[in-house]
């Protein structure tokens, strides 16, 4: 699970990733964990958590493009004078993103890929040793809805200090604290708003692309709390979606509706 993935970090590193009530995944990593991004003119520092989140959002084409379109990152990577006035164009782009990815340590790279793999494990059905279905996967849950097994988000490999990370799906969520538009949307994952409210549906290639195209430069949530939110939402989706759909079908059936009205 997630705890095992993060166990590669020592106790001090874990302490820096910990906040009250959120284990090692918080909206901010505290106490000296920020580092300057090397090789750029703008004086940008990123926390350990932000660096990991940027890497996790680089693992597929749609999320990577939303990351590059992020207006807050473009503003952050704009060189400024001592008064805060812009003195040049934003440096945020492929080169700056690569500079951030090259800041990852070997442990970071291991953690990032293991998170991709863990998220991906929700795609297929899970069976016990006797071949009995334990949990339906997102692919077959979607197939029950549409009749067709959808393609999943395709992993986009990327490098960090010359080492290849295979990439994978990671939930694309936006920061309500940095955008009035996102705040008005009730801190809701844009993916879910666009695909009918089913968290698992966002892992399909079509719906994840819709979410990215609808980003409009919104600032991405660069916190590992996104991961825990995703696990909670998807496990709930896998457990209860079919029951909810079946109940809705019954209640909206005209014969049932008429019987209820006549009761």
Locate predicted features:
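Structural preference for well-ordered, secondary-structure-rich domains
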Residues: 1-263
């Amino acid at each position: 699970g997630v705890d095992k993935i993060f166990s590669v970090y020592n106790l001090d590193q874990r302490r820096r990733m910990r906040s009250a009530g959120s284990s090692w995944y918080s909206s901010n990593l505290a106490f000296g964990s920020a580092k300057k991004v090397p090789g750029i003119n703008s004086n940008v520092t990123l926390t350990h958590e932000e660096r990991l989140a940027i890497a996790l959002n680089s693992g597929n084409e749609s999320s990577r493009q939303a990351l590059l379109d992020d207006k807050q990152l473009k503003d952050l990577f704009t060189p400024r004078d001592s008064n805060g006035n812009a003195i040049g164009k934003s440096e945020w782009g492929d080169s700056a993103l690569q500079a951030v990815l090259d800041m990852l340590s070997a442990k970071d790279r291991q953690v990032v890929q293991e998170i991709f793999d863990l998220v991906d494990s929700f795609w297929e059905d899970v069976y016990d040793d006797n071949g009995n279905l334990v949990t339906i996967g997102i692919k077959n849950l979607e197939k029950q809805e549409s009749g067709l097994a959808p393609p999943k988000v395709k992993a986009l490999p990327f490098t960090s200090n010359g080492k290849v990370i295979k990439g994978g799906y990671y939930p694309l969520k936006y920061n309500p604290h940095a955008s009035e538009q996102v705040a008005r949307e009730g801190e809701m994952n844009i993916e879910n708003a666009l695909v009918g409210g089913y968290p698992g549906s966002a892992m399909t290639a079509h719906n994840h692309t819709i979410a990215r195209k609808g980003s409009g430069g919104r600032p991405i949530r660069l916190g590992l709390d996104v991961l825990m939110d995703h696990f909670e939402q998807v496990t709930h989706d896998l457990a209860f979606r079919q029951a909810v759909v079946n109940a809705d079908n019954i209640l909206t059936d005209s014969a049932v509706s008429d019987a209820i009205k006549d009761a």
